[in-house]
Regions:
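Residue-level signature for tetratricopeptide repeat
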Residues: 7, 51, 55-58
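Boundary/linker segments of alpha-helical solenoid repeat arrays
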Residues: 1, 27-44
């Protein structure tokens, strides 16, 4: 039961893990021979203490995000436009971005090709943004999540948005596109990997279709590969996500 408890804990199911750690203690198990993390404790009592701290936190976070999912509109958004203030200073135009991200002007045929390959309808808000610029690194490269607690991540880094020009490495169907992250890095198959982060693949931003189906309006989530692929809800839709992006303090000082 100790192995099962560890597996649950590493899958961000601390509330369930707590029960199994307690069962292990009742059976007389005091220490764990091998742990999955170098800095993890070996004492079962220490694991129980950890789980007792994190179990209520996990329950609170899951409840909060479940309510957001239930309230949000899952029907596809139509006629989406971005405010000028949102677009102002959004992109970062360096040599790498132009070479590896930025594609040719996006067409309806490009969107249809990507949708067919990935099996999902792209949000109209994403298409609207790609018609303005077909992918690129972001100058507004931070997003504040809705779940604000002093024990969890509040600000999420976003390095760039993947476009629909498959000749670019960092595009939805490019060399380091959505399928690459799902098939090679084993990210959960819940939708489309839409944005990278500064971790180089150890956490990603996804369009999550798990509660709306492939033709619905996906929400935007953060997935932490290093944290057992923990999913954190960010925004009801892609437009709200882009609207909420902001630059680092250093970039703000440069304006």
């Amino acid at each position: 039961c100790i192995r099962y408890a560890m597996a649950l804990y590493n899958s961000n199911r601390e509330d369930e893990a707590l029960k199994w750690f307690k069962r292990a203690k009742e059976k007389g198990i005091k220490e764990i021979d091998e742990t999955s993390g170098r800095y993890y404790p070996k004492s079962v009592d220490d694991w129980i203490k950890r789980a007792e701290v994190w179990a209520p936190r996990r329950i609170e976070k899951n409840k909060f995000e479940k309510e957001l999912r239930e309230k949000r509109d899952k029907k596809p958004m139509l006629n989406v436009r971005f405010d000028e203030e949102v677009l102002k200073g959004l992109w970062y135009h360096d040599e790498f971005s132009i070479r590896e991200y930025l594609g040719k002007p996006a067409t309806d045929e490009d969107f249809e090709k990507v949708e067919k390959e990935l099996g999902y309808c792209l949000p109209e808000s994403y298409k609207a943004l790609m018609r303005i610029q077909n992918g690129g690194e972001l100058r507004k490269n931070n997003f504040e999540g809705p779940f604000k607690r002093n024990w969890t991540t509040g600000i999420f880094n976003v390095t760039g948005v993947y476009g629909v020009d498959s000749s670019r490495k960092y595009s939805l169907c490019g060399e380091f596109g959505s399928k690459f992250w799902i098939e090679e890095w084993k990210y959960p198959d819940i939708g489309i990997a839409i944005c990278g982060t500064s971790s180089g693949g150890h956490d990603m931003i996804f369009l999550d279709y798990s509660d709306c189906g492939p033709e619905g309006e996906p929400c935007v989530v953060h997935i932490d590969q290093e944290g057992g692929y923990e999913i954190t809800y960010l925004a009801d839709n892609f437009k709200d996500f882009v609207d909420g992006l902001f630059p680092s303090f250093d970039d703000e000082d440069d304006d």
